[in-house]
Amino acid sequence: LLVSRLLRGNMTNIVSFSGGKDSTAMLHLLLNQGVQVDKVLYFETEWDFPQMADHLALVTRKTGLPIVKVRYYRHFNEQLACYGWPKSSGGWCAARKHRTCLKYIRGLAGGNSDKIEYIGFSSDEVKRTHTKWMLDRNGK
């Protein structure tokens, strides 16, 4: 039902793409369902594995969609010096990614179209939908 509404609507569909299995599977499923993906947004961590460039090129080649790469204005090592190592409980690293991606998405032109950001995560990560940054993305 949701997919059919998206197909008819005037939406800008943005896939937040980490290059991992969950976001890759989500992108594949959206395209197979006929959802028009307008942007694939990739946050460069500055510490990416060398193989990630090959994976991004493969995804672009297979989907025909260019991948938009965004970066935080402050170098990762500067953040590390200020705040210490990121924590799995959701420290500054997640906030850094969120702010950067959200700034890009809000800056997209699109007339009156709504923007939907798709974020792929596994079923055991459902708690992520209740975090403050996720609620901020939904305008609540």
Please give the residue ranges for each predicted region.
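ATP-dependent adenylation/nucleotidyltransferase module used to activate substrates
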Residues: 1-140
